[in-house]
Amino acid sequence: FLCNLLKFSVECNMIEYVYIYSLAGFSAKEKEIARMNSRMNLNIVCIPGDGIGPEIVAEAKKVLDKVAVKFGHSISYKDILMGGASIDACGEPLTDEAIAAAKAADAVLMGSIGGNTSTSPWYQLPPHLRPEAGLLKLRKELNLFANLRPAYLYKELREACPLREDIIGGGFDMMIMRELTGGLYFGERSTRTMNGVVTAVDTLTYTENEIRRIAIKGFDIAMKRRKKVTSVDKANVLDSSRLWRKVVEEVALDYPEVTLEHMLVDNCAMQLVKDPKQFDVILTENMFGDILSDEASMVTGSIGMLSSASLNDTKFGLYEPSGGSAPDIAGKGIAN
């Protein structure tokens, strides 16, 4: 996971660095000057979270410390509570103090949030007090509207991939760009009883500005990859998807080198297992991206190898493994 996160971060231009020892043609003095100029002082807020989260974050810190020594960086850490750990200690999934600490940081490194939804007492609480409510609130407070989820098949994991060898072929490498702060998860919701019948309502809302900014991110990433964007929607049914498709087509005009195709979400779910090699950047809304990114992660052979970044319109980001909290193996020291 950590190696993939570093590779992924460089690809997305979220870490500015100079790889000193590969600067062919530069003198030793010039390399040392480049090394000095690339040194960073970083303040990273860590959210160990729940389940295996604390174990994962502890190992990640060890790797970051080695990187800091190797390249002369200075990294300071501040741990904050979120999710179930915060509920147990503070009575709420995310405190104002934790939000302030995250806003003051250069980046956030998160482990995992939540527990067993069937047995944990956290899930007997009202929805706004459950572990995941803290993560949703943090995304909104930090304006983390762009979620990047790579799905890459390592040759060492080919045998773990559930797809046939003729489908895998030469492997696949895709990036799922998911809008993260709009749509169904952030719309108005209610549950009420009318004439003796319980009715639940969730609202799916998108503005053209919300769609435009995630589309720009998606096309920017595509320019650094194989220059293809697959925009996924449900435009044959949903008004929000018809607006999505219209705005994405407008953004595409500014990227003539990028090939744009539209795909309905149900077809995309099928194509991910039928021919994953066809995808480069998948651009989609919040709920569709939530589902498709988990599906894509499983055809790689192990979700434990995959990373996730949630970004705003600056270089700030929240970085985490794609896997869950795995409470059944927490504390055993066997988490990947």
What are these regions (language model features)?
Residues 84, 272-335:
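Glycine-rich phosphate/nucleotide-binding loop
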Residues 39-44:
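Extreme N-terminal starter segment of soluble prokaryotic enzymes
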Residues 18-20, 28:
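Short hydrophobic alpha-helical segments enriched in small aliphatic residues
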Residues 45-61, 67, 196-266:
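Glycine-rich phosphate/diphosphate-binding loop of Rossmann-like nucleotide-binding domains
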Residues 50-53, 106, 177, 218, ...:
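Buried hydrophobic positions in well-ordered alpha/beta secondary-structure cores of metabolic enzymes
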Residues 87-201, 287-289:
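N-terminal glycine-rich phosphate/adenylate-binding segment common to multiple enzyme folds
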Residues 72-95, 272:
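N-terminal beta-loop-helix "entrance" segment that forms/cooperates
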